[in-house]
Amino acid sequence: MEKAEAAAVVIPLSVSNPSYRGSGMSDQEVSEEQSAGDAWVSAAMAAAEAVAAAATSTGIDNTNDYTYTAASENGD
């Protein structure tokens, strides 16, 4: 049985790291791309803060403090 060869995957530097785009992009295009990336990060952080605020307002505490006391559970 012949051994199958895996296809080579080439990721251009312009995809994996936009700072390597070279002279093909104008400063305006680079600036717009960076602004779009910054806007995406800001939106994601705002959404995370909104979720955290909603969880706090509904009484969900996410401090990872899972102290268990049997007496308090049993009303003793």
UniProtKB/Swiss-Prot annotation:
Keywords: Host cell membrane, Host endoplasmic reticulum, Host Golgi apparatus, Host membrane, Membrane, Viral envelope protein, Virion. It is a single-pass type II membrane protein. The keyword Transferase does not apply. The keyword Cell membrane does not apply. The lineage of its organism: Viruses, Duplodnaviria, Heunggongvirae, Peploviricota, Herviviricetes. One of its GO terms (cellular component) is viral envelope. Belongs to the alphaherpesvirinae envelope protein US9 family. It is found in: Virion membrane; Host Golgi apparatus membrane; Host smooth endoplasmic reticulum membrane; Host cell membrane. This is Envelope protein US9 homolog. Its main location: virion. It comes from Equine herpesvirus 1 (strain AB1) (EHV-1). It comes from the Viruses. Essential for the anterograde spread of the infection throughout the host nervous system. Together with the gE/gI heterodimer, US9 is involved in the sorting and transport of viral structural components toward axon tips.
